[in-house]
């Protein structure tokens, strides 16, 4: 507790009840894990974070062992880059990301129905996983390095063009209720000066950008379709980060 602001927000929500609009503000699995935590002999908050951490670590470890050609190296990068962020702070994202790794593998095998089911499971842990549908538009066997290299640049360009009104229109007409509510909440935070001072070219995001470009240049022509999907997903994630930079 107190590791970051998210943990304090979760503590305020846990045990506050279910129903109405407040229930829709979180995914179904959030309330299921909350209910299990209430019945646990351990302190509620301890059980809550422990259950999410166990799920996140289990899904990602299973995906690494099954899908990575170099599992030890993959586990090293997971522990150094994502473990704290996913299993200590962004706990819902952490579980959804683990399931998403399996979903992409389904898509790489051409099993689109299985991909949708697994993506639905990921969305039940974090609504934002629904954006994974964009991977349907990505040719699995693409070798267009220039196109992949340009993704972050396109995102940066869009970030200079898009306005709060654009995002509000998308939220109003295209997004389902729960995701729409979160978007509008973030748009309201634009009035907070703390968020206007965020440096998009901070060392962490810049290091991810540089790493992505290195991978684009170095990926072999014989790389697995699954690896190409992972790289494309990485690039789309970075592009989305820059394109939506005006949202806190």
Tell me the role of every PLM-derived stretch.
Residues 8-43:
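Short hydrophobic/aromatic helix or loop-helix immediately within or flanking a transmembrane segment
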Residues 88-94:
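Short acidic/glycine- and proline-prone juxtamembrane loop motifs at membrane-interface regions
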Residues 61-81:
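Transmembrane-helix signature of polytopic, membrane-embedded enzymes
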Residues 10-11, 28-31, 142-248:
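Alpha-helical transmembrane segments and terminal signal-anchor/GPI-anchor hydrophobic tails
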Residues 2-9, 90:
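Transmembrane alpha-helix boundary signature
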Residues 41-55:
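Loop-to-helix entry region of an early transmembrane alpha helix in multi-pass inner-membrane enzymes
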Residues 83, 114-138:
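Membrane-interface alpha helices of multi-pass inner-membrane proteins
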Residues 100-114:
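Membrane-interface transmembrane helices that cradle and orient dolichyl/undecaprenyl
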